[in-house]
Structure formats: C-alpha cells, structure tokens
C-alpha cells in the first residue's frame, strides 16, 4: 500500500526582472498560497544581484526560500554571504542529490556535494528537497538522502530538514 500523498500548489521560480510583479499579481504561485516562494537563480548570478533580488522579494512581503544554494558559484564556501541572506529573512534549500554518495548518483557534480556538505556542517540549510523533474533523469532520492543526513548529522536534524521545516512553511508559519 502506498503512503498517503497530498499534492500542494507551488513552483520553483527562476528569478527574472518581472518576478515581483507576477508574484504580486498571483500570476506565478507562492508555496501553497503562503508568504514563501522557492526562488532559483542562474549558477553564475553575481552575489549583488542575488542579494538585491531577495531584498526586493522581502520588501514585497514574500519570504524567499533560495533553491539549491550549493549550485551558486558566488556562495561557494562563503558562510558569511549565506548567513547574510538568512539574517535578512531568507531560508535556504539544498538538493537531495547533492547529499548522496557517488555510487548512488555518480560523481559528475562532486563540487555541489562538497558545497552542500559545507553548508550542512555550518547549519546553513533549512530544507532538503528533490528538485525532481522526472523519474528517469532526476529521481527524488529523498529516502537515501534522509538516511545519510540522519547518520551524519543526527535523526533530529534530518527530521527538521525533511519533515518539520517543510510542514512549518506550508502552514505559513515562521521557522
């Protein structure tokens, strides 16, 4: 028997100049109608642009969840910058595939795995999510990632990243 599954409305939003207007007019969705929006940038977006974009979202009353922070070159091994984003009111997310061991997912994106570990070790991550686009090329691997986080950082931390924090924001509450 399959577990109960509830699908909630939301999207990963690639940040462009018209995102603020589209969010304000509800043309693109926040996460389940909450104050939270999952925001993605190009891997090569300069930090100043990331910071400005997130500041603009916050001024609009949208709380950004910065998608897969391990991808952004400007945040690599930069605890200060990630803390600055968190301190201004943002939350951060890493992908489950960035936690996996090479035998499960390959070694193509080793640099992302190192970055994800760096952020996890410094308690700079609020969520782990799948970034799943399809089952063939990008399966979720959530169970495998949960087990690794639980083993390396403790069951409590795994529950927080995979279960508790997502429930909190979907209820439109503050972590």
List PLM regions with ranges.
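Conserved, mostly hydrophobic/aromatic
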Residues: 68, 131, 166
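Mid-to-C-terminal alpha-helical segments outside catalytic/metal-binding sites
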Residues: 142-175
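His/Asp/Glu-enriched short active-site or ligand-binding loop at hydrolase and phosphoryl-transfer sites
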Residues: 89-103
């Amino acid at each position: 028997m399959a577990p109960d599954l509830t699908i909630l409305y939301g999207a990963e939003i690639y940040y462009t100049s018209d995102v603020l207007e589209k969010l304000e007019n509800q043309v693109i969705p926040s996460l389940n109608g909450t104050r939270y929006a999952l925001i993605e940038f190009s891997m090569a977006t300069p930090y100043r642009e990331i910071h400005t974009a997130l500041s603009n979202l916050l001024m609009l009353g949208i709380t950004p969840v910065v998608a897969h922070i391990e991808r952004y070159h400007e945040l690599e091994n930069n605890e200060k910058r990630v803390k600055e984003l968190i301190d201004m009111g943002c939350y951060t997310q890493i992908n489950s595939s960035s936690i996996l061991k090479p035998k499960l997912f390959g070694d193509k994106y080793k640099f992302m795995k190192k970055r994800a570990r760096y952020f996890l070790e410094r308690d700079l991550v609020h969520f782990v999510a799948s970034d799943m686009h399809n089952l063939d090329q990008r399966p979720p691997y959530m169970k495998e990632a949960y087990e690794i986080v639980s083993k390396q950082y403790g069951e409590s931390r795994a529950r927080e990243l995979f279960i508790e924090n997502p429930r909190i924001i979907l209820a439109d509450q503050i972590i």
